Design a protein with these regions (language model features):
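A glycine-rich helix->loop->beta "capping" turn
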Residues: 51-70
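Catalytic loop of short-chain dehydrogenase/reductase
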Residues: 66, 70, 74-90, 110-158
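N-terminal Rossmann NAD(P)H-binding glycine-rich loop of SDR-like oxidoreductase domains
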Residues: 7-20
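Conserved active-site helix of classical SDR/Rossmann-fold NAD(P)-dependent CH-OH oxidoreductases
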Residues: 19, 98, 142-153, 190-197
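C-terminal helical subdomain
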Residues: 162, 166, 174, 181-221
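Hydrophobic structural elements of the Rossmann-like NAD(P)H-binding subdomain
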Residues: 61, 69, 117, 164-167, ...
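Rossmann-fold cofactor-recognition segment
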Residues: 31-48
Length: 221
């Protein structure tokens, strides 16, 4: 791996992935809303920021997202669901990453191996949903998973050595998760980044369109 592009590179996990890659000697390009004005809810800003880059990148990581929808905590009951929170979650956690992918595709090599990794969440798995709750966030992440799965199918026709996957990083110690970790084991962002990169290092085109956790175990859709 020689060149990597990290979207969401000032967030806890995105920054840790970028730092870990740089420590390996990879040439890392970092882009984010706070540093570069890349707003995943604004396609014009996505197009402008990514359109200014010159590829190809061996690795593109989309590490954007949020838990709170329209300023509300994740719902514990159906009665707490609002249209505003649902729409906000889909804008940030599904539509935004897909638009980033759309404008990032020209930055992937067509004749060489590459990985496009999008951070998802285990709670977006329909098959693994046993306790309910977090309705807006779950639904948005499930939609993201479907979008990436479909994109991987299309990508296989044009970039035969590419691998596009969704990755669950675990519960990472960041401001993003601080209020919701509860009894779940949390890991520091550098450890989470190392875990994810260990998975990314082993990916092949045959695994494209799938959903993996930080240990490389496949998660059901």
């Amino acid at each position: 791996m020689e060149r990597a592009l990290i979207i969401g590179a000032t967030g806890g996990i995105g920054a840790a992935i970028a730092d870990a890659l740089a420590a390996r000697g990879v040439a890392v390009t970092r882009r984010s809303r706070s540093a570069d004005g890349l707003d995943v809810t604004d396609e014009a800003s996505i197009s402008a920021v990514l359109g200014s880059l010159t590829g190809p990148f061996d690795l593109i990581v989309i590490a954007t997202g949020k838990l709170d929808g329209a300023g509300n905590r994740p719902e514990k009951a159906i009665s707490e669901v609002t249209a505003e929170a649902l729409a906000d979650q889909f804008r940030v956690n599904a539509i935004g990453p897909m638009l980033v992918l759309k404008h990032a595709l020209p930055l992937l090599p067509k004749g060489a191996p590459s990985v496009l990794a999008v951070l998802s969440a285990r709670v977006g798995s329909i098959g693994d949903n046993r306790i309910g709750g977090w309705h807006s966030y779950r639904a948005a992440k499930a939609a993201l998973n479907q979008l990436i799965h479909g994109a991987a199918i299309e990508l296989s026709r044009t970039h035969k050595q590419a691998c596009a996957v969704c990755l669950h990083p675990g519960t990472v110690q960041t401001p993003f998760t601080a209020a919701y970790a509860g009894r779940h084991r949390t890991v520091p962002a550098p450890e989470a980044a190392a875990n994810l990169l260990s998975v990314i290092d082993t990916l092949t085109p045959a695994q494209s369109g799938r959903f993996f956790d930080y240990a490389g175990a496949e998660i059901p859709w």
